[in-house]
């Protein structure tokens, strides 16, 4: 048993020793392989390093060669440029030398000429001295022979020449003036006749009545209303007389103000068509008619400017122009008259080479003040100038308005043409009627007197001027003041107006109290 254990131990020891040497040999073998591999790697790294070193050297040599080549080329270019600059400088130097030589030659030539001129000047001065002495000698001899001094002889000759020339100039001026007047008369007659022939005016005298047709005679009673309240309301609101007589199916509206008459006609037409006729409805329709008339006035103004070819007028001026449709002067419609004057002035301006459109503009606006002369103080010329200035019209237009009646001196040819065209249009046979104009002026004066008093809201001359109705403000005029106002207006009418028969003065003071039930 003990021998077995010993044998086992010996075997174990021997095995351990053998294993140790085997492992050592294996380790040494591995170490040797690793050394060989490391040496091989080192060798390969050395070869790669040598290759990279050679490659870097080659690249460095190539770069050095390129830089050297570029440097040599740059040096050659610079040398070439320097050579060119040197050549140019040498050429400039040669040119300067040649110019200097030429200047020296010219300087020598000029000096020679200057010397020759000095010699010639001295010779001329000597000759002038001799000539002056001879002239003085001859003048003294002439003065001795004629008995006149030099100044006396000059004055005598000048007087004689002046006398002859003055006579000839006067004759020439007289002949020129005669020819100019004859030519101007012929030219003016030709231009006026041509303008009149080319401007055809179709216009008849305005009337002071309008007729409203009725569907039947029963409508007359409804228009009059209970105890005449409807007709009174309509007449009070419009200031127009309603004449209801035996004329079948018609009502006549009479009034000198065409705008009021047109307003009344439209309102009455609407009332007849609607069938409801009572004071409240009448007020509503009259107000609606006023708006329609205002719109119609604007459209008339725009249509007129389009017809005449005048553009760029201020909208307010266009509306004022449209009001001229409802304004007459001696029975002649002022808007038609203004259009006629515009065309006549334009035609004459074109013949004379002036601005045709500016002449038309001045002719169209020459009576613009008549549209509101019954509302604003001053003559229609003053009002027209004020309107044209306010709306920045051309200075020629303003002067044409101011001078067309001779109140101001015309400053342009167009202003003279507008005045001539105005006279032509007014003087045309049948264009105006003096009697109608006087009648309308009397009615306007009636209203002007009534409205000049404080507290008067509106006044209407009706019944062909036989009555004036005055609407007063109830908060300013009481019943006693109304009677006093009527007396004062009556006295002024008697003092300032000439009229046939009697004029009834009616002062109306109306107070309304309105409440709404909810």
UniProtKB/Swiss-Prot annotation:
The keyword rRNA-binding does not apply. One of its GO terms (cellular component) is plasma membrane. Signal peptide: none annotated. It is a single-pass membrane protein. It is an enzyme of class 3 (hydrolase). Residues 334-427 form the HD domain. GO terms for biological process: mRNA catabolic process. Its main location: membrane. The chain crosses the membrane at residues 2-22. It holds the Pfam family KH_1. Its EC number is 3.1.-.-. Gene3D superfamilies: Hypothetical protein af1432, K Homology domain, type 1. One of its GO terms (molecular function) is RNA binding. Keywords: Cell membrane, Endonuclease, Hydrolase, Membrane, Nuclease, RNA-binding, Transmembrane, Transmembrane helix. Residues 208-271 form the KH domain. HAMAP family: RNase_Y. Endoribonuclease that initiates mRNA decay. Belongs to the RNase Y family. This is Ribonuclease Y. It comes from Geobacillus kaustophilus (strain HTA426). The gene is rny.
